[in-house]
Every structure is written in structure tokens, then in C-alpha cells.
């Protein structure tokens, strides 16, 4: 009986199996190129994941590997004004500190250059695009990734990636699933080249409510389900409370970040951070809390000590000490990262702020104060600031600010 044309021969001998596998590998590499098939242990790009720090040692710890993985897709989602763009801009600043090139695709047309500068972003070296359509935004992202020169790309946001057909149509026209199909097609093209170029793409996304959900969470993200599958890390950012809202002025938000998906480390870790208006996440408070947790900084009563030296009584004074002594902060950070992430190369997140960054912070804070003041005037009419009780509330607010966040009670740093 003749053998079938497509019959696969059975190989029983182990040596013959290895020879057959080697012949198959050579044939695959001849057809598809060098490196198309390899053993996992021989691929250093897969075994050793490079990272970009998040700008907060607490968030780096929650991510499990010391930061965001390069060559992967990251999704940051949450309600409005929860700190999504702030977290993404901190990642951009950290990439630039390592000598990387960053791009920001501003689909919402809402990027504030002064605020980005206040967070440490070098806006002179930041590539920015404000596309008109979703197709244009994703094609720009693909071109940047294919160049192999860009380290991180931020797309703000998925909800603003409007398909061309929707823009060309009339107001009120139904475009069922159009954006989801656009995202699915784009991610299929992007996911392979992202890994080869070692570029990281951060998608900022909004949440919506599903109608008719009786059980479980009614929340979902925009753009369909494709991004949920292709993302290696998904961060759920929520605002817990507004700091200072019970006093005369709000000066920050306390947020909770939950790693709801993580393909490079265990997921579902949570971290709480304070975001200061006009300044972003305070890294020194995060460093102090993490170092105390890992017993690198000792805490006895209200006193904090590093080695044999006391660095401050109370959290505000300890944070102020670290901010004024960046060399000690860098030394503590190095010890902390070596303990949490052994084998990872160390690049400090703490650098002396330039004069331009300090001025940008002051401008951002003043702009926020004016904005809050105009809103208050519109709601309450003429505002009286001569009342003694208002002055007492102001003093109490500053004292509370110093206690919670770790800044001095005066206005020198706010």
C-alpha cells in the first residue's frame, strides 16, 4: 500500500528527533528569517525585560519589576480627574532622564506644556502630535514605532480616537462598533513591531457605564475589548479623596492605583499616592514610606533615622530632609531597588530640579489657584478674605498639608 502524500513520519529515537527538529528550524529560518524559532533561554530579549521607572517607588513595587516593561502595551484607565495623564507624564519624564526619546499623541488636544514641564518633562525634546482622526493617530504611532528610535509613546486618549467615518458623518449618526474595529485592527499591527523595537506605548483610557447590568461592575473601558487582551499591564486609577477640600483650598488628590492585569509579575497589587496640584506625585514621600516598609529607614516613635543618623522628627520633616539632600535620597533609592529588584540596572529618579522646572511649578500652582478662585467667586459671589475664621482655616489647611503630604507648612514650596 502506497504512503499518503502528506503523511507525517513518526520519530521514536531521541537523536533522530533532535536532527529532525534542527532540520525544521533551518527550514523555518530560511523561509522566515534568522531568529524566527529559538529556545526561550537563548532569547535575552524575552528573558530580561527592560523597564522604564514610573516616577514613584511605591508604584514600581506594585508593578513587580521596578517599572513599566519596555516593548509592551500599557493601559491606564479610570474616571475623570483621577491622575491618569499625570502618571503617564511621569513615565515620559523618567524615560527622558535615561536618555530616551518620548512622543505624546494628544488626541484630546488638552496637553498642558507648563504642567508637563513642572512634572520634569523636557518639553523641548518631547515630540507632540495632535491628530484629527483616530486612523491618523494610530498611523503616526505605527510610524514612530517602526522607526525604532522612540522609547515611549503616550496616546491620550482612546476615547478621543474618532474614526474618519464618524467625523465625515452627520451628528447623531449611528456608528456601532466602528472604534472597536479600528482599535482591534491597529493593535494587531502594532503588537509585533512594538516588541521588536523595544518601544512602550501607553494608552490612556476612559470608563463608561454599561446599561442593564444587574450583577457585577457596570463599568467598562472605551474602544472595545482588544486593548484589554493586548495590554501587558493595565492600571486602574481612582481618586480616593480631595486633600484640603474641608478647608479654605484644595491642594491635591489622594489616589489609589490597582494593577488589574500584569503579564510580567503578579497582578492585583494596590498602592496609594498623593498628587499635588501643579507638581504631580511627590517621589520623596513614596521613597520614605517604601524605605520604612523595607526597614532601610528606621522609625522609632515619631523619629526617622537612616543608619546612625536621624533625618527628622515626624514625616513632614523627614520628607523635607530627603528633598534637601538628594545625594542621600539617591543612596536610599539604590539600596531599596537592589533589595526589591535585584539584578536590575540602577538609574536614580531623583535629580536636582532646574530653574525652569521650578518656575513652571510655580506657574502651574498659581494657575490652579486662580481657577479655583474664579469658580468660587461664580458660586458664592463676592468673596471676603478678611474674616478671622478664614485665616484660621488657612493655617489649619497648611498644617494638615504638611502632616499628610510631607511639605513645610509655609508657602515656600507650594
Swiss-Prot record:
Residues 361-414 are annotated as: Disordered. Keywords: ATP-binding, Cytoplasm, DNA damage, DNA recombination, DNA repair, DNA-binding, Nucleotide-binding, SOS response. Signal peptide: none annotated. PROSITE patterns: RECA_1 (PS00321), RECA_2 (PS50162), RECA_3 (PS50163). Gene3D superfamilies: P-loop containing nucleotide triphosphate hydrolases. GO terms for cellular component: cytosol. GO terms for molecular function: ATP binding; ATP hydrolysis activity; ATP-dependent DNA damage sensor activity; damaged DNA binding; single-stranded DNA binding. It comes from the Bacteria. It is found in: Cytoplasm. Residues 361-384 have a biased composition (Basic and acidic residues). Pfam families: RecA (PF00154), RecA_C (PF21096). GO terms for biological process: DNA recombination; DNA repair; SOS response. Coiled coil: none annotated. ATP binds at residues 78-85. Belongs to the RecA family. NCBIfam families: tigrfam_recA. Can catalyze the hydrolysis of ATP in the presence of single-stranded DNA, the ATP-dependent uptake of single-stranded DNA by duplex DNA, and the ATP-dependent hybridization of homologous single-stranded DNAs. It interacts with LexA causing its activation and leading to its autocatalytic cleavage. PANTHER family: MITOCHONDRIAL DNA REPAIR PROTEIN RECA HOMOLOG-RELATED, RECA. This is Protein RecA. It comes from Treponema denticola (strain ATCC 35405 / DSM 14222 / CIP 103919 / JCM 8153 / KCTC 15104).
Amino acid at each position: 500500500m502506497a504512503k499518503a502524500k502528506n503523511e507525517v513520519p513518526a520519530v521514536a529515537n531521541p537523536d533522530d528527533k533532535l536532527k529532525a527538529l534542527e532540520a525544521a528550524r533551518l527550514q523555518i529560518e530560511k523561509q522566515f528569517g534568522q531568529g524566527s524559532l529559538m529556545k526561550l533561554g537563548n532569547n535575552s530579549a524575552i528573558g530580561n525585560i527592560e523597564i522604564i521607572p514610573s516616577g514613584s517607588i511605591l508604584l514600581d513595587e506594585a508593578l513587580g519589576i521596578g517599572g513599566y516593561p519596555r516593548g509592551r502595551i500599557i493601559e491606564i484607565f479610570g474616571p475623570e480627574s483621577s491622575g491618569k495623564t499625570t502618571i503617564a507624564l511621569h513615565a515620559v519624564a523618567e524615560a527622558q532622564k535615561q536618555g530616551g526619546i518620548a512622543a505624546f499623541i494628544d488626541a484630546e488636544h488638552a496637553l498642558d506644556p507648563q504642567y508637563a514641564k513642572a512634572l520634569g518633562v523636557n518639553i523641548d525634546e518631547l515630540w507632540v502630535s495632535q491628530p484629527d482622526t483616530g486612523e491618523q493617530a494610530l498611523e503616526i504611532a505605527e510610524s514612530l514605532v517602526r522607526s525604532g528610535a522612540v522609547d515611549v509613546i503616550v496616546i491620550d486618549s482612546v476615547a478621543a480616537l474618532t474614526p474618519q467615518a464618524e467625523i465625515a458623518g452627520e451628528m447623531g449618526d449611528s456608528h456601532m462598533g466602528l472604534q472597536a474595529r479600528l482599535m482591534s485592527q491597529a493593535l494587531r499591527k502594532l503588537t509585533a513591531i512594538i516588541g521588536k523595537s523595544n518601544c512602550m506605548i501607553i494608552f490612556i483610557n476612559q470608563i463608561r457605564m454599561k446599561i442593564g447590568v444587574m450583577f457585577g461592575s457596570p463599568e467598562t473601558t472605551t474602544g472595545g475589548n482588544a486593548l484589554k487582551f493586548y495590554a501587558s499591564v493595565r492600571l486602574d486609577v481612582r481618586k480616593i479623596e480631595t486633600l484640603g477640600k474641608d478647608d479654605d483650598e484644595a491642594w491635591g488628590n489622594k489616589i489609589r492605583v490597582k494593577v488589574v492585569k500584569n503579564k510580567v509579575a503578579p497582578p492585583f497589587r494596590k498602592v496609594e499616592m498623593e498628587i499635588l496640584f501643579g507638581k504631580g506625585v511627590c517621589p520623596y514621600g513614596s521613597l520614605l514610606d517604601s524605605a520604612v516598609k523595607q526597614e532601610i529607614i528606621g522609625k522609632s516613635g515619631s523619629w526617622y533615622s537612616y543608619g546612625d543618623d536621624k533625618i527628622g522628627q515626624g514625616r513632614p520633616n523627614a520628607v523635607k530632609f530627603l528633598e534637601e539632600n538628594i545625594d542621600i535620597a539617591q543612596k536610599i533609592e539604590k539600596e531599596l531597588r537592589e533589595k526589591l529588584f535585584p539584578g536590575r540596572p540602577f538609574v536614580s529618579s531623583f535629580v536636582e530640579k532646574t530653574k525652569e522646572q521650578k518656575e513652571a511649578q510655580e506657574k502651574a500652582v498659581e494657575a490652579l489657584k486662580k481657577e479655583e478662585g474664579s469658580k468660587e467667586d461664580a458660586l458664592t459671589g463676592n468673596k471676603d478674605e478678611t474674616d478671622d475664621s478664614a485665616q484660621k482655616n488657612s493655617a489649619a489647611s497648611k498644617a494638615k498639608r504638611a502632616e499628610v503630604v510631607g511639605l513645610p507648612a509655609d508657602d515656600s514650596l507650594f
